[in-house]
Curated annotation (Swiss-Prot):
Alphabetically ordered keywords of this record: Ribonucleoprotein, Ribosomal protein, RNA-binding, rRNA-binding
Segments of this protein annotated with the region Disordered: 113-175
Protein name: Large ribosomal subunit protein uL22
GO molecular function terms attached to this record: rRNA binding; structural constituent of ribosome
One cellular component term from this protein's GO annotations in UniProt: cytosolic large ribosomal subunit
Residue stretches of biased makeup (Basic and acidic residues): 166-175
Family under the similarity heading: Belongs to the universal ribosomal protein uL22 family.
HAMAP family: Ribosomal_uL22_B
Protein's job: This protein binds specifically to 23S rRNA; its binding is stimulated by other ribosomal proteins, e.g. L4, L17, and L20. It is important during the early stages of 50S assembly. It makes multiple contacts with different domains of the 23S rRNA in the assembled 50S subunit and ribosome. The globular domain of the protein is located near the polypeptide exit tunnel on the outside of the subunit, while an extended beta-hairpin is found that lines the wall of the exit tunnel in the center of the 70S ribosome.
Amino acid sequence: MTTTEFPSAIAKARFVRVSPRKARRVIDLVRGRSVADALDILRWAPQAASEPVARVIASAAANAQNNNGLDPETLVVATVYAGEGPTAKRIRPRAQGRAFRIRRRTSHITVVVESRPVKDQRSAASTKARRAEASKTAGRAPAKKAGASSGATKMPPKKASVKTSEASETKGGSD
């Protein structure tokens, strides 16, 4: 667990009946995103593990709001991971008296949300103006690449193999 300089809240769901590997697949989609974005992504994710992960994120956001008095608009999913819980072992009967083992895996899902300051949003017009200014300055003085001037780093072109008429004559038969 990492210590943070931002105020945070934690929520855990233990013994969730989903494989940790499948939960991690969903968790990787939302790590580092805002809580609203994360819940929106999980709402439309087709994986079955998205529902319990969304519940834990919503619980962490509620903990942050109710227990710590944090603003829900500034909450970001800072840390989220799925650990392995106990595995229930079951038996599936198979042909000729055999029995195969079924592993019902569980996971412990932990979410830490932090209240981070909102980054200032730039308007589309200011972004266009900034890009236009950057392209003007780049057009005036093109920068030379340092590695392009040295000829020692380039590889010489490969020589093409030339077929001779003797090689093609002896190809078909044996002498």
